[in-house]
Amino acid sequence: MPRKGPVARRDVLPDPIYNSKLVTRLINRIMVDGKRGTAQTILYNAFELVKERSGNDPMEVFDQALKNIMPVLEVKARRVGGSNYQVPIEVKPERRTTLGLRWLVNYARLRGEKTMEERLANEILDAANNAGAAVKKREDTHKMAEANKAFAHYRW
């Protein structure tokens, strides 16, 4: 923790094609070893596949997918009197988006399709239709929070 107060958040620039900061953040999540060009190519090709398969604007499909992935509640471990409790807490909007993007990319990477473009496109389409591994992760997170509702009074 810095002594001079909170560290200022570094803002990302909107991407050149869709003019969206969310897309830039997704590119940053996809990026491996600093290869931004490769990450951009993967994302833009995935968006083209989404456009072909759904017939809708890829940004709308992506926004819907992200809405379906972002968690509202999560559990946080809290130590009380020698035992750990999983305390349900509300997820802040910034973290909600971050978790949604992280889960989308991670579960796209685990899929079986041949190229990352196909994996990402299919995961976005699945998430937009309330299916897929990323949506399941959100459901599991919510179930954990629901199951531990009894410990909600330990919140801090």
From Swiss-Prot:
Gene Ontology, cellular component aspect: small ribosomal subunit
Keyword tags: Ribonucleoprotein, Ribosomal protein, RNA-binding, rRNA-binding, tRNA-binding
PROSITE patterns reported for this sequence: RIBOSOMAL_S7 (PS00052)
GO MF entry, a single one: tRNA binding
Record carries keyword Ribonucleoprotein: yes
The organism's place on the tree of life at top rank: Bacteria
Keyword Phosphoprotein: no
InterPro entries the UniProt entry points to: Ribosomal_uS7, Ribosomal_uS7_bac/org-type, Ribosomal_uS7_CS, Ribosomal_uS7_dom, Ribosomal_uS7_dom_sf
A Pfam family that the UniProt record links to this protein: Ribosomal_S7
CDD domains hit by this protein: uS7_Bacteria
GO biological process, alphabetically ordered: translation
Subunit structure: Part of the 30S ribosomal subunit. Contacts proteins S9 and S11.
HAMAP family: Ribosomal_uS7_B
Family label: Belongs to the universal ribosomal protein uS7 family.
Function: One of the primary rRNA binding proteins, it binds directly to 16S rRNA where it nucleates assembly of the head domain of the 30S subunit. Is located at the subunit interface close to the decoding center, probably blocks exit of the E-site tRNA.
Protein's UniProt name: Small ribosomal subunit protein uS7
Organism from which the protein derives: Shouchella clausii (strain KSM-K16) (Alkalihalobacillus clausii)
Lineage: Bacteria, Bacillati, Bacillota, Bacilli, Bacillales
